[in-house]
Amino acid sequence: MNSRQRVLKAVNFEKPDRVPIDLGAVRPSGMNAIVYDKLKKRMGINTPTKIRHTMQILAQIEPEVLDRLHIDTIPLDVNSAAWAQMDAHKGLKKKLFCGLEVYFAPQTKFKEQPDGSWVLLNASGDVFGRMPKDGFYFDFTRPTMASKKIDPKLFKPRDTVSDEELDTLAKQAKNLYENTDKAIIGWGANINLVGLSSLSADNITQGSLDEWLCMLMVEKETANEMMDRYVDAVIKCLELYHQAVGDYCFAWGIAGDDAGTQRSELMAPELFAEMIKPHYKRLCHWVHTNTNWKTFLHSCGSIYNFIPHWIEAGIDILNPVQISAANMEPERLMKDFGGKIVFWGGGCDTQKVLPLGTPEQVRDHVKHNISIFASGTGGYVFNQVHNIQQNVPVENVEAMFETAYEYCKKVCQ
């Protein structure tokens, strides 16, 4: 059974020859470039490290590393696709504060500030990100937007995709499908309904989150109209993506919608069911009616009480399964939702165990989680909870993937 077959078995609730393993198939399942560079050097791989996602300084995971770690998945998004078709040395070379030399996409624009920080500029030359001196990530900087009221008239979600992006994705999808056996996940034009508070269009939160949450309660008609426009726009983009890549992808990331905190959901489940769920249902219905894709949702935090609503709305796959959050224990999730939704993640806690534990503690933790999530027939893909951070000991990363491979085989025997 090859990787693509293995993943398809798992997401269709059939028993694979081993539990599939993911690293970097979507942006929130990857690895910071600093620890990635350490890991691949221990493998004897000395190639330049490319940055796939600038804000988070996420590495572009190379094919040799994917194979060495027994990874079954591979991403399809415009950032990774463009990089895959380009030699690293054509990128923008820059040293991170730790001294590591990496390559950013050629169009990346930085500006160093007098205080030693870096700011990130968009195509118009406006600052939209800042990394403090000696920092590891860029933070979004939108103080003027956050201080203004939401104006629904100005909310104009992007409803088209450039020919250049579609052409890049089409070529890369064909290349990945024909020259690898890995399962391909598409990512782009995903919705953010729980966190939607916009002065202009994008799939990232702008303006005031608390104002948007209040609108969901007291300005329901306006909020619904905005979400209708959002879903309409996303469907138009997904239609273009599907025309470009078709069935080369088995799933598409339709939503990056962080709906929980460490302790609870961001709103009452009843409000979610009334205001948010219908829009998810319409989007999922379009995907399932017009494509063969599985619907992939990324949502961090304690989201236990939203999961049944997402299942009813048509979400097929849930990531990152933040097991360290309240009510998100593997046993509870499998007892209540096993066989109803694919859990993609939850394999290793990245808040405490992976960065702070010993390799042996990591191994025991990974074995326990796999034994629970893989206790049914299919329905599970191993992935750590969200991205592996820069301060994680590389020995722990090795322990996690070694144990995952060994134990993912064992539980399927």
Positions of PLM-derived features:
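Active-site loop segments of alpha/beta catalytic cores
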Residues: 1-40, 45-51, 131-132, 140-413
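Repeat-unit-sized solenoid/scaffold elements
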Residues: 89-116, 260-262, 266-267, 319-322, ...
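Short, glycine/charge-rich beta-strand/loop segments that flank catalytic centers
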Residues: 75-90, 188-193
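A gly/proline- and charged-residue-enriched helix-loop-helix capping module
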Residues: 93-169
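Short, charge-rich binding segments
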Residues: 64-68, 100-101, 110-111, 175-179
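Segments that shape or occlude catalytic/ligand-binding pockets
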Residues: 36-84
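Generic structural hydrophobic/aromatic packing signal, biased to beta-strands
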Residues: 21, 66, 74, 110, ...
